[in-house]
Amino acid sequence: MDQDIKTVIQYPVGATEFDIPFDYLSRKFVRVSLVTDENRRLLSNITEYRYVSKTRVKLLVETDGFDRVEIRRLTSASERVVDFSDGSVLRAADLNVSQIQSAHIAEEARDAALMAMPQDDAGNLDARNRRIVRLAPGVEGTDAINKNQLDTTLGDAGGILSDMKDLEGEIHDYIEKFADDTALVRGVAWVYNLGSADGGETVITINKSTRTYAVPYIEVNGSRQEVGYHYSFDLETQQITLATPLKAGDFVMVMTTESQLPVETLLASSVGASSIGTATGETVEERLTRLYGHFVHPETYGAVGDGITDDRVALQRSLDVAYENALNGTGPSTVRWSGDYMVSLNPNSLGVSGELAAGRSALCIRPGVSIEGKGTVRLDPSFTGSQSGAVITNWAGPVDDCSIKDIRIYGGKDVATGTGITGILILDSQRVVISDVKVLNSTAGGIYLRKGATEGLYGCSFSKVSGCTVDNAGYIGIQMERPYDNTVIGNTINRCEDNGIDVFGNVNDATVTGIAQSTLITGNNIRDVLNGVFIESCGNTNITGNYIADFRSSGVIYNRINSAANDNSLTSNVLIGASGASAGVSFKNSVGYCTVASNRIQNSDYGIRCVGGGITGLNILPNTMKNIAKTLLFVEARNNGLVKSRMSTQFYEGAQVGGIPSNTSPRGVPHRFPSRLSYIVDIQPFWATEQGTREDNFERAKGTLASITGWGSKCALYDTIVAGDTVVSLNSSSVAVGEYLEINAEVYKVTSVSATYAVVRKWTGSDYTAGDYAAVIISNPSYIIRRVQWGEQ
């Protein structure tokens, strides 16, 4: 290869590893190919070659059929690698990455030109012993001709020779002009002495207002004069010395130039970016000034952004500078992270009681600072221990009006030695915005807005988490502690070992509702978690329009630790459990005053589950349920399990088989927590798509006891058919052992049946007792048969 070529190198095949002799900004700008004179094959990174180091690649494929390996740099001219910071000075000695990208593009363009058909040392175009293919026949006298045209006209050798001589002269003129004119930026033509020479002049002084750096050529009366042959130019004196004196009246035009710097040198200079135009009409300098001035870049402070080097100090410096700018109004307060940054835990990070252990956090965001830029922050996975910390947090105090947007945070969950590090943890701040952030593989939580200070009621206020992704978290996906007017909207949460979204507001007072105000959780997609949304000892939350699937316990759960979880709303959500899931919605430990409406609940043991007792004030409006294994509304077997509540008719997709799913847990069972549902509880039967209105409270059948002639036209006998027991006129085809009969508001248990009668014993306050009940079971009374489960669940 020509040694002037800097961005392309070819090696003979035979080895497997090859050096990359040039620098590059990104691996995607490097092309590795197998080549011959007639063929070329571009290789794919990872599958056909890989990087041994930053400056060396290794082939993973055979080279049969090829004789050379080519490594070429091809930098994107449209994909900007980085931006510039406000007020930066562009010098060759300290070019930033973006300037280098511009220089790379220009360098590759020059190499492409040289490789296409460069000049040799004599100024001739050099095809380098390669054919020029697909050349059209020449038309004009100065056109090149192809072999067919030459063969056709070869008979007229004299004419051909003459044409070739003319062509040679024209090409020589062009090459000479191209070789001599090294300027990139030309000035306008300058006319000597108002267009008329005095005569006899051999020296002309250029008296332009701007300095001339070169004179590529001059014309005397239209005849081109070549530098070095017809004249010379002295840069210091600005004088042209002519080989032949001028004649009186000669018209002399001098072509001047503002710069004689090579392209590479010019682009590397402090004015290089101002010499490159863009499609919008701006120069690169103008464009970068307009964009770069809006951001603080960690690269300005030494960040490498290769995903390997520890860039924590540079990233923290960018945050601190942005904070200083926000305080003083002296520059941008937005930090742009666009690289791939490795960060270690900061051993000097401060602890916050109950939230952060000292030395367990990496970066401290500051008030009024925004982070954005599609960059990646990777936590160095070599950390140990399990104390709580965070990749990005605010150990120095509240960070009102901060934002974090459009970055990725990798926590190293699957490779880290230690645990306990949350992706983002913001404490005690107002107007916090976290949007379009991806927190992946966290060893603890994903995104937390919590309360750390001992004073004040609330944690973070007037804040929003939107459009974020939390995947593979070691604990909770998104958590808020004591929120005030916070919104969690449009997030994707997947694979959390605990809750998808968690709202915590407990206070040590059992007489009050926990602390939370105006919390909206909407439009989130939550999957593969323990519980989809967990409302812990607080109220005033609105959970609506979320898609929660593959939860292992409950889709949504309301729980009390000390203070209550009251005054909540749960509407229009899709709640689909994983295999073995407990309930679509759970209420636990004296919580309530919640409206549950228009939700789709599917694939769980229970549709709605109430445990712990004292669940109060549930307003369960119509919901759609499907594949409920046991009960639509389960209430734990204890008195006052559910009080002052109602359930409207639920819509069930499917059929009830053998009383399953039941509408509710048993109600009014005299021997088993008769006040399980108490203090005005209204329950409506559910409606099934396959059967219409279904049985309620395990009511399997009802009817009227028939009189039997052989029994003296009675419907019940005592101590006649079965000694010491009462029998009624039901038989084994209508009732089963263990079922219950309600007759005249009394409850009887069926203890045996035959083809003609059923033996019943009455609940007498402590047990089902044998006795004479025929005297009260008269006049063909109505009866209700309730299933065995009614008395057992």
UniProtKB/Swiss-Prot annotation:
> Where mainly found?
virion
What cellular component terms from Gene Ontology apply here? virus tail
UniProt-listed Pfam families: Beta_helix (PF13229), Phage_T7_tail (PF03906)
Q: Which UniProt keywords apply?
A: Degradation of host capsule during virus entry, Degradation of host cell envelope components during virus entry, Host-virus interaction, Viral attachment to host adhesion receptor, Viral attachment to host cell, Viral tail protein, Virion, Virus entry into host cell
pH profile: Optimum pH is 5-8.
Note the SUPFAM superfamilies from the entry.
Pectin lyase-like
The listed locations are: Virion
Q: Name one GO biological process term.
A: symbiont entry into host cell via disruption of host cell glycocalyx
- Record InterPro entries: Beta_helix, Para_beta_helix_rpt-2, PbH1, Pectin_lyas_fold, Pectin_lyase_fold/virulence, Phage_T7_tail_fibre-like_N
What happens to activity at different temperatures? Optimum temperature is 20-70 degrees Celsius.
Q: Does the keyword Lipoprotein apply?
A: no
Q: Which Gene3D superfamilies match?
A: Single-stranded right-handed beta-helix, Pectin lyase-like (2.160.20.10)
Free-text note regarding domains: The N-terminus anchors the RBP to the virion. The central part and C-terminus probably binds and degrades the host exopolysaccharides.
Function of this protein? Functions as a receptor binding protein (RBP) and probably mediates the attachment to the host capsular exopolysaccharides. Displays a depolymerase activity that specifically degrades some K47-type polysaccharides of Klebsiella pneumoniae capsule, which allows the phage to reach the host cell membrane and bind the entry receptor.
Name the protein family: In the N-terminal section; belongs to the Teseptimavirus fiber family.
Q: What does the annotation say about its assembly with partners?
A: Interacts (via N-terminus) with depolymerase 2 (via N-terminus); this interaction probably gives rise to a branched tailspike.
Q: What is this protein called?
A: Depolymerase 1, capsule K47-specific
Provenance organism: Klebsiella phage vB_KpnP_IME205 (Bacteriophage vB_KpnP_IME205)
